[in-house]
């Protein structure tokens, strides 16, 4: 099966200059865990909810809430994003996407059509496909779990 058949189409993308609080709002309102980052229309990175959380000051900080807000609004996604993210072309296979995500220990991939971001494929998308195929093949999921099986 091709990536384009399972991906989330037309993902929300952000510019490198977007402040972290704005990225947080987009992620929260849209239920996204990752946002492709563009500079002059070209993919240059990906920012995840984890990147955003790690950029926040710890609870043990001695900064006041006003100082924290001041600093956070000046940090952009460019400063915390993963640069040159692993991508896959839309005509690639789901199996290849799964392998890339496993090899790189990531939860999703920007999907490209040439140099343009046209989608996102995630581990969740792959798992849904797996469950749909299992159901189609008559596997109910009621069997004993295979603890530690790979």
Residue ranges and their predicted role:
Residues 14-31, 38-39, 81, 87-105, ...:
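The conserved cystathionine-beta-synthase
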Residues 28-36, 55-57, 62:
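Short, charge-rich amphipathic segments
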Residues 27, 35-51, 101, 109-124:
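A glycine-centered beta-loop-beta connector
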Residues 1-10, 48-86, 98-102, 122-150:
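Tandem CBS (Bateman) regulatory domains
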């Amino acid at each position: 099966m091709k990536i384009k058949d399972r991906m989330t189409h037309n993902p929300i993308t952000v510019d490198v200059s977007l402040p972290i609080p704005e990225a947080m709002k987009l992620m929260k309102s849209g239920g996204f865990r990752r946002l492709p980052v563009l500079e002059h229309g070209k993919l240059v990175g990906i920012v995840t909810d984890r990147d955003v959380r790690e950029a926040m000051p710890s609870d043990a900080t001695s900064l006041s809430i006003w100082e924290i807000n001041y600093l956070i609004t000046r940090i952009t996604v460019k400063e915390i994003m993963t640069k040159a993210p692993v991508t896959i072309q839309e005509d690639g296979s789901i199996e290849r996407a799964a392998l890339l995500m496993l090899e790189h220990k990531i939860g999703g991939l920007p999907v490209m059509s040439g140099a343009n971001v046209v989608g996102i494929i995630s581990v969740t998308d792959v798992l849904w496909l797996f469950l749909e195929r299992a159901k189609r093949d008559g596997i109910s999921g009621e069997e004993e779990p295979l603890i530690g099986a790979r």
